[in-house]
Amino acid sequence: MEISFSSSFKKAFRKRVKDTGSESVFWEVLEMFMTDPYNQKLKTHKLSGKLAGLLSFTVEYDLRVVFYFTKDKPQKAILVDIGTHDEVY
């Protein structure tokens, strides 16, 4: 699966994750996501309310990634935001 990073994701990643202990974990979990986006360990789920139409998966206990799938073939995921539960929801 192809992954793209939105400008808002890149900004949030630099601010909230880069140069922390979570950065290496993020890249490992992203590999898992690319192989199977619905792996049980990721806890991938649809969002509701103001984030309806988006999905989320868990990187660590309190680190989430918000994303959506494009209708392209092959499937492509666009990562929109990353942060704690309170930061992204």
Predicted regions and their residues:
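A short, hydrophobic secondary-structure junction motif
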Residues: L30, D36, D86-Y89
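Enriched for short, Lys/Arg-rich terminal
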Residues: E2, S8-R14, T58-Y89
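A short, surface-exposed loop/turn module that caps and links secondary-structure elements
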Residues: M32-F57
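Short, charge- and proline-biased low-complexity linear segments
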Residues: E23-M32, A77, I82
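Flexible domain-boundary/linker segments
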Residues: K18, F26, K43-K50, R64, ...
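Arg/Lys-rich, positively charged N-terminal/basic patches that mediate binding to nucleic acids
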Residues: M1-V29
